[in-house]
Amino acid sequence: MFEKPLGMRDTFPQIFEKVEAVRQTGRDFLTKRGYEFIKTPAVEYFDTVGKASAIADTHLFKLVDSQGNTLVLRPDMTTPIARVATSKLLKEMIPQRLAYFASVFRAQEAEGGRPAEFDQMGIELIGDQSVFADAEVIVTAMELLKHLKLEAFKVTIGHAGILNCILQDYTESIEQQTTLRTLLVHRNYVGFEEAVDSFNLPKAKADALLQFIEEAMDVKDIRDIEKYVRKNDALVYMQQLAQLLEMADLAAYVTFDFTLSSHMSYYTGMLFEVFALGSGFPLGNGGRYDGLLEVFGSKAGATGFSIRVDRLLETLHGQSEMQQEATVVLFDEEQFEAALIKVNTLRAAGKLATLQLRSSLVDEEAFLAHFTEVVVVGQEEIGSE
């Protein structure tokens, strides 16, 4: 009777405070870098945002309004922001630097064990097609994580266009390309090899695909994969991106993996994922999604990233934390006025202070354990830790 809907979670006070700390720190950091925060509705039209989103239809929360329109709870923030930018903001200024901290919703299967609602923090840089915009997004993501006191992380960068080109050149059907791309999304390299064998491709093509997968997962020099790719500007673009990240003194955090593929199908160019010690899943991801804005009638370039706040907190968990100083003022009924004066004095001094009637406590010892200082009105301070 008292169960929550599948995939929904309660946020208890201690976690809530940590989430708010991340929100405030992130907002201050991103605002100082020229990003303006935006909020979009939790509910959007299925025919626009729902269909444009890269989230599978089976993972959308759908509902119907009183006029019979099919709606969805927003499954991501990039698509709603693309809607807002193309309909209004890009008419005011180009490029747009937008930021957000919001919940997104994705329906889960019973055995999935994953949250159906979670917070994301991220940015979208809309209206700039240059490699410098992609570099800015990656650098901002890394510097944000460092600002949040996360040092042990890696950023893996790939390119959707280069991977698509290779799959097109070395397979013989769209179905084969889709199969291999799906296996790469799930990092199922054994399955990839088995699929290539099952396609009965010409030996030269099959060997090239398997050799590419082996070499492309940890590329030291982007020129090493030139032999697999038809001449195109994407390789030059990625070489420029690598140089810009070196100039930002962040190359030590970066690896290039040209097998990287995402379930977010709107990525058209550079894409990346952030991995950190302490989390079994990517902490965040981002990339260039120029094609998404065309759905809303604009040809402006766009790039961005998002961080999963719950996974960030899991990663930060265990790092040294100082307990926040908190005082409780205990009083008996006849001491209320004196207790009120005392607690207001503490609060005016900037302290976190709670006022508590002593007779209402069921387990005084357990209650007081949550405070670093205890003041009993009418007595001297009786405890501090």
UniProtKB/Swiss-Prot annotation:
Keyword Cytoplasm appears in the UniProt entry: yes
Any single Gene Ontology cellular-component annotation: cytoplasm
Additional facts recorded: This function is generally fulfilled by the C-terminal part of HisG, which is missing in some bacteria such as this one.
Function (record text): Required for the first step of histidine biosynthesis. May allow the feedback regulation of ATP phosphoribosyltransferase activity by histidine.
Swiss-Prot/TrEMBL GO biological process terms: histidyl-tRNA aminoacylation; L-histidine biosynthetic process
Oligomer status and interactors: Heteromultimer composed of HisG and HisZ subunits.
Superkingdom: Bacteria
Keyword 4Fe-4S carried by entry: no
Pfam families: tRNA-synt_His
One function term, GO molecular function aspect: catalytic activity, acting on a protein
Chief place of localization: cytoplasm
Biological pathway: Amino-acid biosynthesis; L-histidine biosynthesis; L-histidine from 5-phospho-alpha-D-ribose 1-diphosphate: step 1/9
Family: Belongs to the class-II aminoacyl-tRNA synthetase family. HisZ subfamily.
Coiled coil: none
Keywords: Amino-acid biosynthesis, Cytoplasm, Histidine biosynthesis
The protein's name in its UniProt record: ATP phosphoribosyltransferase regulatory subunit
Location of this chain's protein in the cell: Cytoplasm
Organism of provenance: Lysinibacillus sphaericus (strain C3-41)
